Amino acid sequence: MVLTAGDKANVKTVWSKVGSHLEEYGSETLERLFIVYPSTKTYFPHFDLHHDSAQVRAHGRKVLSALGEAVNHIDDIPGALSKLSDLHAQTLRVDPVNFKLLNLCFVVVVGRHHPTILTPEVHVSLDKFLSAVATALTSKYR
């Protein structure tokens, strides 16, 4: 899916709200992921997965920082996330479906905190962007 200029502008608008809340929104996204899709916990056997865990907060910040890199390099998402794709495909061996599940949880978090900006048009743009991120992250699985 190609991101239009309008999609890119919409994603950057969302990120202008999210970017200053990386740890908060990131940990909330992960907590939702673990609750709604409990099988995703298997990738974090060494983490304290309780609410407000320092490990979940730190990893949430990492996850959203990576999304921020994708936003900052929106015209070259695969290039921006290449090393992360290698890590997840070759070392961590994360099932690619989990990126889609994480994306769903992230959209819920954005909508919960910023309901007025998540219009149908912005939602579509964000979905397209997150799909491009998931595609980039799974590109090294072959």
Swiss-Prot record:
Domain of life: Eukaryota
GO molecular function: haptoglobin binding; heme binding; iron ion binding; organic acid binding; oxygen binding; oxygen carrier activity; peroxidase activity
The protein's assembly and partners: Heterotetramer of two alpha-A chains and two beta chains.
Family: Belongs to the globin family.
Keywords, alphabetical: Heme, Iron, Metal-binding, Oxygen transport, Transport
Protein name according to UniProt: Hemoglobin subunit alpha-A
GO cellular component, one term: hemoglobin complex
Protein function: Involved in oxygen transport from the lung to the various peripheral tissues.
Amino acids binding heme b: 59, 88
InterPro entries for this protein: Globin, Globin-like_sf, Globin/Proto, Hemoglobin_a-typ, Hemoglobin_oxygen_transport, Hemoglobin_pi
Tissue-level expression: Red blood cells.
Provenance organism: Chelonoidis niger
Transmembrane segments: none
Domain Globin as annotated: residue spans: 2-142
Gene Ontology process terms (BP): hydrogen peroxide catabolic process
PANTHER family per the UniProt record, alphabetical: HEMOGLOBIN FAMILY MEMBER, HEMOGLOBIN SUBUNIT ALPHA
